[in-house]
Amino acid sequence: MLSITILFLLIAEGSSQNYTGNPVICLGHHAVSNGTMVKTLTDDQVEVVTAQELVESQHLSELCPSPLKLVDGQTCDIINAALGSPGCDRLDGAEWDVFIERPTAVDTCYPFDVPDYQSLRSILANNGKFEFIAEEFQWSTVKQNGDSGTCKRGNVNGFFRQLNWLTKSNGDAYPLQNLTKANDGDYARLYIWGVHHPSTDTEQTNLYKNNPGRVTVSTKTSQTSVVPNIGSRPWVRGQSGRISFYWTIVEPGDLIVFNTIGNLIAPRGHYKLNSQKKSTILNTAVPIGSCTSKCHTDRGSISTTKPFQNISRISIGDCPKYVKQGSLKLATGMRNIPEKATRGLFGAIAGFIENGWQGLIDGWYGFRHQNAEGTGTAADLKSTQAAIDQINGKLNRLIEKTSEKYHQIEKEFEQVEGRIQDLEKYVEDTKIDLWSYNAELLVALENQHTIDVTDSEMNKLFERVRRQLRENAEDKGNGCFEIFHQCDNKCIESIRNGTYDHDIYRDEAINNRFQIQGVKLTQGYKDIILWISFSISCFLLVALLLAFILWACQKGNIRCQICI
C-alpha cells in the first residue's frame, strides 16, 4: 500500500512539473457535497453551504424555577388560595412570577361560583403575591365566624380563612348592617366578599331571619346589589346551597360601604395590589424541576436562542414567537454548487461559473492555479471577510425584530361567554397566522440578501483580477484566466494579493498572444468556419447535380415526361 501511494505522488508531481501550457488561474468558491435548502423571495428551494434552523421544536420535560419564580398551587387553584380554602393555607404570603395551576386542583370548602371568575383570576395572578391585610369590622348584633361541615380543617368544621360568615344573632335578630371602610393608604385594595344562596326558605329564615335578604356593596364609582337566589340545587359535598363571590377594588382616597339585611359573606380584610408587578398564571400538569429557563409553556420550559418556536401557543416569559411552521432556515453561507467528481487530478481547475470547490475549507472564496511549478489552491480571506461581515449579526438582528417580551395564556370563559371565547380564539388564530406569514417573509428576505451578498463578493473578486491582468490574460468564460506570460508561484501570489504589476509582463504577454493567435483559432471561430465550409460544399454539390441534369436533357440522354 505504501509503494502504491508513493508511486501516485510521484506521478502527480511529475505531471505537474511537465506542464508546458500557459499558466492558468481560476476563481472559485467553497462548496459542500450536501448543502441545505432554504427559501428566498424568488425561489422555494435554494441550496446553500450552511444554514441555521430558527424554529425551536424541542422542550424540556419540566418547568424551570429559575430565573422566574414559580409557585405550585398543587391541589389549590388561585381563587381557592385567595379565599383561604382548607388545604391552601400554605400559600398564605406566597409570591410568584408564574403561579402554576394544576388540572387536578379541587374545591375543598363550601360550593361556590364567581360570576366574574376570569377577571378575578387575572387580577390575582398579575398581582404576584398573596399579601393579605387583616382589618377590624364592627358588625353589630349578628353572629360571626359561621362554619360548615363541608369545609373541615382536620376534624373541625371551618370556613374560608379570609372570609366571615355572618348569621342572625342568638336573639334571633339580623338588623341592618351598614359599615364603611376608607382607603387612606397609598395602594389599591382588593376586597373579596360573597352572598349565600340557601336552598330553601326555611334555611333562609333559620340563618338570617329576614326573607329575602339583600347585600349591597358600594364605592364612589361603583355599586353591586345582590338578592339571594333561594332554591334547590344539586348536592355538592353535602350541600345544596351556594355562595357567589364578588370582588371590589378600592383606590386610594376612596371608600367601600357594606349594606346588608342578610346573606353577606363578609371580608376579614383586603389584598394589597401591586401595580408594578407583572406576574401571570399557567395551567399545566408538567412538574417543576431544577433547570434554568426564562420561557415556560404548558408542555414544559424552553431553553433556546432561536427566535421562533412551534411547541405551544401558550407561552410565558421571554419566549420565542409561536409560528405554525415546523422549520425556517436562515442562510448563513453562500449558494452551494457541489463540485463535480469526474475531472481527474486537476479537473477542478474549472472556475466558479461551473461549480464550487469542496476543498476550499479555510475561506469562502479562493484561487486555483496551474503553472510550470505545479498546481495550488489558496483562499481569499479579504473577500471572505467582507461577506461574513455583512452576514454576521443577521441572526441577532432577526431576534431583535421578534424579541418582544410577552405572555400568552389560555383564556377561560363561563359557558354563557361562549361567543366571546370563539371571538378570542379567532383573534388569536389570526394573530398567529399573521406572525407565521411575517416570519416566513422575513427569513426569505434575509436569505435573498445573503445569497445576493455572497454572489456580489464573488463578482467583485473576479473583476479585481480581470482589471489586474487586462490584456496579459484571456478570460476563458468559466471563471478562469489563461495567462500569456511565464507566471511562477510568486507571480500567482501577486495576482491573489492584488500586487500584480501588469506593465512588467505586458510585452511578453503581447508577443505570446500574437504568436498563439497566428496559428490557433479559438473554438468559436472554428465553429463558424466549419459551418460556412459545409454550407458552400452543399451548395456546390447541388449546383453540379442540376448542371448535369440539364446537360443530359439537352443531349437526349435523359427524357422527362410529365403525365396529367
From Swiss-Prot:
Post-translational modification: Palmitoylated. In natural infection, inactive HA is matured into HA1 and HA2 outside the cell by one or more trypsin-like, arginine-specific endoprotease secreted by the bronchial epithelial cells. One identified protease that may be involved in this process is secreted in lungs by club cells.
Pfam families referenced in this protein's UniProt entry, alphabetically: Hemagglutinin
GO biological process, one term: virion attachment to host cell
Cytoplasmic side of membrane: 549-564
One function term, GO molecular function aspect: host cell surface receptor binding
A GO term from the CC aspect: viral envelope
Keywords: Clathrin- and caveolin-independent endocytosis of virus by host, Clathrin-mediated endocytosis of virus by host, Disulfide bond, Fusion of virus membrane with host endosomal membrane, Fusion of virus membrane with host membrane, Glycoprotein, Hemagglutinin, Host cell membrane, Host membrane, Host-virus interaction, Lipoprotein, Membrane, Palmitate, Signal, Transmembrane, Transmembrane helix, Viral attachment to host cell, Viral envelope protein, Viral penetration into host cytoplasm, Virion, Virus endocytosis by host, Virus entry into host cell
Protein name per its UniProtKB record: Hemagglutinin
